[in-house]
Amino acid sequence: MQIENSAAIVTGGASGLGAATARALAARGARVALLDRNAAAAAALADEIGGIAVTCDVTDETAVRHAIARSATAHGPLRIVVHCAGIGTAGRIVGRDGPMAQDAFEHVIHVNLGGTFNVLRLTAHAMSQLDPAGEERGVFIATASVAAFEGQLGQAAYAAAKGGIVSLVLPAAREFARFGIRVMAIAPGFFETPLMNELPPDAVQKLVAEIPFPARFGKPEEFAQLALAIVENPALNGETIRLDGALRLPPR
């Protein structure tokens, strides 16, 4: 898929991996719509890159439909979606205070997996109505996690949600093949994000020690670089790519 002059949506686009991806797409000439719950941060970045900002909860069908319509009105046919929105929470299934609350588990699944599916189904439907751009109509990139493969203690809900995203990619790609819509996922390891930047130095050193090479947190720009490579390579479809410096998470 050509990036220049293509309309793109980036969810979770106001910070972290989403913001880096939005900047990278805009730098290559894409017309970017930032979807985020943080209206002020999204608006500031939209002004910086010449895009638009739409306040959006990715689990809300009405909000996502509105965002797709806003993008189409401002930028034309939607071709690229990079879904970065999600939450990271920790909690043991059975902790000192008893079993994890069922609604706490369901909330993580609802936001991370349900939100991904909601954005996927609605944007894919919009893309399916378009005329092809070359040999394809669009591409959707989800954000999984290495926790999908090696969930640590306290990550049961998060790992289950991200594992669901990994499992969603292939059947979705097979289903959308008739439309010429690709579906991919990136599974990042430890990255420089607002959450990670709040960790104390000793905790950072402990995490970095688990990464073979490069022995550091990934940079959001490196996530964005892979996202753009996926967009431009039509043979990449139905797969989750780990982006982790050969990291394999230990049990804790």
Model-derived features: positions:
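Residue(s) in the substrate-gating loop at a strand-loop-helix junction
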Residues: 145
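Canonical Rossmann dinucleotide-binding motif of NAD(H)/NADP(H)-dependent dehydrogenases/reductases
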Residues: 2-33
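C-terminal substrate-recognition "lid" of short-chain dehydrogenase/reductases
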Residues: 131, 219-243, 248
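Active-site helix of classical SDR
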Residues: 120, 161, 169
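Catalytic Tyr-X3-Lys loop
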Residues: 87, 98-118, 140-141, 165
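The beta1-alpha1 cofactor-binding region of Rossmann-like NAD(H)/NADP(H)-dependent oxidoreductases
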Residues: 39, 56-67, 102
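Short, small/polar-rich loop/turn modules that mediate ligand/substrate recognition or access, typified
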Residues: 177, 182, 236-239
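Conserved mid-core segment of classical short-chain dehydrogenase/reductases
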Residues: 88-106, 125, 129-134, 154-157, ...
